[in-house]
């Protein structure tokens, strides 16, 4: 009887320990303090959550437009972009990989807004959509999906032919292309490196929008061709453990990590609601990203409809 009691007690303690460790693993990043204690990666700034008017369609382009008209967002992005630009110039970097630890952190919109901010500062900027499994850059810029990186990697396009000019005062873009999902293994190959080498002379900054590096190897393979990397961390989304693992993975591939930026920040913390990323009318911006075992795999509660990552 006593041995059974001891076994039951040990089993109960182990269960409590597993629950504790599981809870610790799920603790999400709420502020810079959560990461400063566990990583030496540089904090580059925080972007506020942006609301979309109730009657507006909550699409990637609508959210991007709302950000462009938010003075608080624009000022925060201006500061972040200046820090990034200064660091890249100091190290003579031209190409920067931008990723996130998990799906749904607003990475793609961050890339496009950063590109706009750097362009306003007089830099020649190119955005390349390297997320061939789930391309989203064209959605943020409100453009149809057209020939781009996938076609180039398949050998059916020249470097100059796949660049789309969005107009005066806007960055240029290489969209993912129509043959998405078929050329991902070539992102770490010679063809992609040749493309970047051909484009470096034409641009001051080349931003590579990649899949979340915690769940896809595409980002890490792309990183081998990049000069540096930046991680977008959505407040109260990815766990601290996944963020730390993503930073470590980038470092293990020899990609200098420029730092991280907090995204979609509010003062409300857990249980936040409202418009913008967090979901008016059942929209959950970036949630339900197409990775994982099935559609709807993601890190938010709402999964009815999705936007770009």
Where are these regions (language model features)?
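Well-ordered beta-strand positions
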Residues: 205, 228-231, 259
